[in-house]
């Protein structure tokens, strides 16, 4: 009687963590700690007096001077709450304008054929090569000629549309929306604007969320723009208002940290609202269909 040798089962891969994974996790953790440390100490210093902040070693846990720092902040910046609301208004207006104009421009570049399309797109992309400070003086002169100095239009209009946003929208629309879908809508009698509103906008939600969050943060952190076109302290945005506290005798570091801690809250709210869209937008195209 012959016997049949059964094949020896191969040993599966070990389910343990590979040493290279441990190293990778350690590097990521170290990077996260380095990035979060300034925010941690900002919140800590907001609750301590200047004397405690400048002591060695510096405090590493919360104190009980936040109310004093906030009171000092409001004394030095009597328009602080107006500055905060003003910054929110400008950032939201710039974000809304970018979402509308960049999505329209990206839709046109992705789905329409028109004369000098390639040249115009290359020109728009070429503006990304110019450093931002190159346009500061021309922008200030134009705002002065138009009589927009110290007005919200001086901050909103120049930032209403950007090359990066147009590029993001164009690439996403070209890869996520099939032309056959738009042709079918045209056959059904839908107008071009109706196609944009009813078909394009719902399908580019992840890209809009990413662009909106990036634009809001950039507008919120904008320092040079308000510095050039705003004259009254009441019209200062948050970064400019906090910067004005330096150079006025003894710098109130506790008050600055308290104001910075308050200024971070709108960014956290925006990130919480748009984080899902941000992740979807960043991972779009990473998985091949």
Stretch-by-stretch model annotation:
Residues 4-6, 20-289:
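A structural signal for multi-pass alpha-helical bundles of membrane permease subunits
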Residues 1-16:
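Short, Lys/Arg-rich, polar N-terminal cytosolic tail immediately upstream
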């Amino acid at each position: 009687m012959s016997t049949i040798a059964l094949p020896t089962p191969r040993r599966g891969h070990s389910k343990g963590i590979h040493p290279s994974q441990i190293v990778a996790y350690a590097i990521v953790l170290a990077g996260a700690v380095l990035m979060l440390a300034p925010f941690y100490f900002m919140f800590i210093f907001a609750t301590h007096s200047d004397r405690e902040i400048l002591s060695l070693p510096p405090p590493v846990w919360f104190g009980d001077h936040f109310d004093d720092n906030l009171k000092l902040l409001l004394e030095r910046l009597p328009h602080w709450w107006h500055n905060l609301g003003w910054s929110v208004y400008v950032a939201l207006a710039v974000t809304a304008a970018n979402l509308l104009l960049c999505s329209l421009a990206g839709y046109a570049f992705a789905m329409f054929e028109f004369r000098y399309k390639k040249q115009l797109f290359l020109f728009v992309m070429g503006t990304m090569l110019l450093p931002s400070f190159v346009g500061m003086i021309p922008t200030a002169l134009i705002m002065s000629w138009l009589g927009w100095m110290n007005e919200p239009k001086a901050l909103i209009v120049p930032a209403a549309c950007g090359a990066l946003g147009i590029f993001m929208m164009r690439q996403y629309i070209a890869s996520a929306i099939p032309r056959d879908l738009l042709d079918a809508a045209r056959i059904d009698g839908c107008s071009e604007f109706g196609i944009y509103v009813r078909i394009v906008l719902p399908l580019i939600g992840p890209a809009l969320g990413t662009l909106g969050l990036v634009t809001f943060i950039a507008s919120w952190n904008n320092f040079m723009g308000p510095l050039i076109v705003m004259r009254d302290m009441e019209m200062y945005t948050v970064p400019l208002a906090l910067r004005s506290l330096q150079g006025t005798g003894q710098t109130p570091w506790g008050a600055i940290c308290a104001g910075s801690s308050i200024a971070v809250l709108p960014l956290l709210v925006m990130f919480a609202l748009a984080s899902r869209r941000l992740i979807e937008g960043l991972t779009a195209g990473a998985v091949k269909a």
